[in-house]
Amino acid sequence: AGGEEMYQIAQDMVTMLREEEGCNYVICIGHLGIDDETAVTANRSIDLLAKVTGIDVFIDGHSHSTEEEIAEKTNADRKVGDTVVTSTGTKLENIGVVTIKDSTITTECVPTEGIEIPADNEIAARAAAIAAEVEAEYGIVFAKTEVTLNGEKAPGNRTEETNLGDLITDALVWKATETGETVDAAITNGGGIRATIEAG
């Protein structure tokens, strides 16, 4: 869903949470972002919040924005209507903190640089075991390609048909036909194709 349909779904959910569930606060975790790229379709968090009331805090993603960048698109309080918008930037540079005290909501981003957390040996061992399984699986050659398969964003899978997108959807059709049903077509999200596969 997007645009007006998305706004209505969000508003219905907020109404249900407040009126039927009796929630005092509604905190929305979303992946809409504030970048100009999505402004064309009016699918940014700030577009949604201009149409939806009753959300106290919107914890955003997608555009990897900092609170300073959000303030540039909104105001010094990072508010759209009564909703505070927050986001932690990118690559775990910050840890987001939302505090609700005496009906006052504040948000902040705590930089992770310099924070040291002691390793948990049990978790480290489990993570290493999973990584070994993945590496073993990735090491198996199951196919070869004579051409480079385009996994680029633009120009590429987000802007046009590509050979890697074709391969993926052909594979989806092939697998789906194993159900015995007639399959006419398959569609894949260009945003889910993340890397080029070199010839070889």
Located regions from the model:
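Phosphate/diphosphate-binding loops
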Residues: 85-94, 100
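Binuclear metal-dependent hydrolase catalytic cores centered on His/Asp/Glu-rich metal-binding motifs
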Residues: 1-25, 106-108
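Residue-level detector of flexible, active-site-proximal loop/helix-junction positions
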Residues: 65, 92, 194
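Solvent-exposed loop/linker segments at secondary-structure transitions
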Residues: 18, 25, 36-50, 57, ...
